[in-house]
């Protein structure tokens, strides 16, 4: 059985960006508009510096007041151009970033919904939430910010070089010696930044998972006085994240001054060259020297930004790799083509053995039994004996590698997954409700399929109508996250109503009445007894009183069937079932 682990591949920046590009490509018009605006923004900046030469040589040097007045309007025009192009570039890039993040999140969300249950067993919810929220946003903020810097500062440097070369090509040659050194430096630190950024994102996932664990288990924490334990756990994880963050800052802080020092050497070289006879005799005016020197000073900022953008861009690429690691995982297998509308409900297990991923011990060992259509089989045994595993295999939450499970004589592997699960309704011990109305929770994923009358009928059959009618908006009451405003018994009744409404031929009740009081349990049991006439029912129960009328009872122990028969026959055997029964009713 293939293990579904999150494991990032160490692709190069170029390989990662190539995978990201198909998500960006549909919005390339925004990128082009932003790029053009950034280029004009850079030209306006470099143009302002170039104007220093005529201002100094012609305007102030020759006291040409008419020229100075004209130049004043030119300067204002260039500043307006800078403002307009800055707005266009920022807006267009924000639009593209938002679209890319939305596309990535939608792909992730859809992919996660089709992952097998085993994937979620092995990966914490907190880390997955961090991937969808933090990492996807990191792609937008890092990549868009990096793109702005690369295009604007790159265009600015090129335009400054053009201005310098046009003004004095001799002095400009100094930069062609310094440039390759800076390029080599940036290449070296890029791999370091990507590795450090990956570690930082992993720490963010651990932090989210730790926080989520405390929030979800808050009642347990305060009940057992575990605040100190959780605080220590959180402090350790948050300090680990802080340390990894400081490594990023250290690498960033070291690379920045190194580039600045190398660039400053170019300024020193220009000052010395300006005094040499070759340059001095070449009619180098004050305006020309000022333009070259100012251009070199102005180039310090974009060089610094381009150095910093590398770390920013690597954070985005590292986030991409973590997200692509999820998208590369194989979704739940759905190779079947058979459809039954509806199935009759005859179930059969043939020599089924099963072990959970990462565990050598078998959860089920050579299990064989059959349930004729319309009959009820009950599974009893101690916790961890394998009862719930049997229920999970019927719906293919997990796939077996040994044996067969048949529905109406057809291997469930041959069914289309959606069709198989349409024919099975599950009510488990742990009820999950959505932050929606009661009606929408009962008719979940099929609100348009059922009428309000059918929803009310299902609620009535589940003995939920009484408490629903007492709520402020009745069936239109929003119940909060996971039904937080309801009691455990009320939540369980809604889950039963959901299963009743679905009207599937196979009904799986995994401790379905465990959260109900005795009176409610009797009422629910009466409703379930009526359902057994037309459905195949698998009942998993600790309370043996709820399964006395089952057509067959299987006693499961350590993944094997120890005893089988109806209630009366098993009591007469005086075996494991009799012991369980005596333990429950001895008091």
UniProtKB/Swiss-Prot annotation:
Keywords linked to the UniProt accession: ATP-binding, Cell inner membrane, Cell membrane, Lipid transport, Membrane, Nucleotide-binding, Translocase, Transmembrane, Transmembrane helix, Transport
Main location: membrane
Residues annotated as domain ABC transmembrane type-1: 32-315
Top-level taxon of the source organism: Bacteria
Entry keyword Cell membrane: yes
Domain remark text: In MsbA the ATP-binding domain (NBD) and the transmembrane domain (TMD) are fused.
Subunit: Homodimer.
Name of the protein: ATP-dependent lipid A-core flippase
